[in-house]
């Protein structure tokens, strides 16, 4: 299995996919067929196709999955989310003004799930802000479990990466994901689930109390005692 990592060159930003060069050259892919670009913004509609990400920054992200665009990729994401595969996985590659990538349980960007890689399902949906798309290697048929969320449009990715959904709520939470490759203190997916499962937000551990030095008055009081 080739290990997906996002990294191909887009306006000076690397956006290919794996330090190991793919042996197979990119196959010629036919132009995508016309598709319905409608995005239902109500997460209560068709909750079986709404992915919910609860992040360690305390926010929640709702993603409208589009099986009409990429049926096999949507099914893979739903299966892995249902198995708890993404729980605890970090955003290991987060580039300001570009995208946030996750989906590798090793946190290195060089791994994925034990499942077989997927055949590309490139489509006409544009890579706009909030787009959720699959990471892959130079081999077009190497997407597995890693995906990325766009901070800003990058139309150079259209028809080169499988676009399978769009953020419909919580883009401010996405914007708050810690930057870095990898970040020093990465944001995690605490819980990934489908809206149909109606899972409550996980309770996050409280941050440790900050240490403070004693005040002058406290020092003087201790001396007088």
Regions found by a protein language model. Give the residues of each.
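Cyclophilin-like peptidyl-prolyl cis-trans isomerases
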Residues: 2-7, 16-225
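Metal-dependent nucleotide-binding catalytic modules
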Residues: 10-11
């Amino acid at each position: 299995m080739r290990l997906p990592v996002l990294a191909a060159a887009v306006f000076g930003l690397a956006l290919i996919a794996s330090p190991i060069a793919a042996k197979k050259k990119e196959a010629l892919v036919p132009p995508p067929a016309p598709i319905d670009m409608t995005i239902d913004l109500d997460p209560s509609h068709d909750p079986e196709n709404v992915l919910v990400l609860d992040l360690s920054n305390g926010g929640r992200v709702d993603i409208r999955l589009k099986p009409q665009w990429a049926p096999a990729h949507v099914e893979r994401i739903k299966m892995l989310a249902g198995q708890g595969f993404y729980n605890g996985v970090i955003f290991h590659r987060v580039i300001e003004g570009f995208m946030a990538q996750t989906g590798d349980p090793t946190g290195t960007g060089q791994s994925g799930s034990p499942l077989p890689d997927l055949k590309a399902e490139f489509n006409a949906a544009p890579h706009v802000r909030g787009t959720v798309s699959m990471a892959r290697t130079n081999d077009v048929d190497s997407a597995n479990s890693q995906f990325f969320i766009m901070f800003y449009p990058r139309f150079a990715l259209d028809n080169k990466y499988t676009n399978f959904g769009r953020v419909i709520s919580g883009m401010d939470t996405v914007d708050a994901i810690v930057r870095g490759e990898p970040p020093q203190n990465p944001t995690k997916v605490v819980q990934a689930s489908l809206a149909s499962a109606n899972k409550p937000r996980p309770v996050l551990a409280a941050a440790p109390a900050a240490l403070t030095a004693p005040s002058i008055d406290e020092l003087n009081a201790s001396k007088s005692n």
